[in-house]
Regions:
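Short beta-strand segments
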Residues: 19-53, 61, 68-72, 84
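A solvent-exposed, acidic/Ser-Thr-rich amphipathic alpha-helical stretch
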Residues: 45, 78-79
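Alpha-helix boundary recognition
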Residues: 16-17, 62-63, 123
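Charged, gly/pro-rich active-site loop segments
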Residues: 1-7, 81-141
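Short, basic/aromatic recognition patches
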Residues: 1-22
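A short, aromatic/hydrophobic, helix- or strand-capping loop or linear motif
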Residues: 27-28, 72-76, 111-120
Length: 141
């Protein structure tokens, strides 16, 4: 689905690699959008996000798997790119816990320690994996 060879695709690839947060928007029971920043890893095909099991985003995904994600408009290098993904979210019961995923630990170990938690404690607290497969991407660079 993603062409990483175009100018837009290269910007997407850069953001997937370098951004610390992505904004996840779910839809609540009243049909209202509910955005929140989340930690993520991109596995080449989908976003993987970890959540506390009773978080609203988990309930929202179970009731309506249609979600969107977007990056902040300006990245750390000052680039002003707009990238918005639409996708299908699901609870991934087969995902390894966060502390057993090298890519997740490379990216967020310092942040986890900043929460006064060990990686294993983080994985126990944020034990629900949400996988999001993009169905559409739009924006401009």
């Amino acid at each position: 689905m993603l062409d990483f060879n175009s100018k837009f695709g290269r910007a997407i690839k850069k953001h997937l690699k370098n951004q610390y947060f992505v904004w996840l928007t779910t839809v609540d029971a009243k049909g209202a959008p509910q955005p929140r920043p989340v930690w993520f890893v991109w596995d080449g095909d989908s976003f993987l996000i970890f959540s506390q099991p009773n978080a609203y985003k988990v309930k929202h995904v179970k009731n309506n798997p249609k979600v969107s994600l977007h990056f902040n408009t300006t990245d750390n290098a000052g680039e002003k790119d707009v990238i918005v993904f639409n996708g299908q979210a699901s609870i991934d019961n087969k995902a390894l816990p966060a502390h057993k995923l090298p890519a997740y630990m490379r990216k967020y170990k310092t942040g986890i320690l900043g929460l006064a938690a060990t990686p294993k404690e983080f994985s126990e607290e944020y034990s629900t994996a949400i996988r999001i497969k993009p169905t559409e991407v739009r924006g401009w660079v």
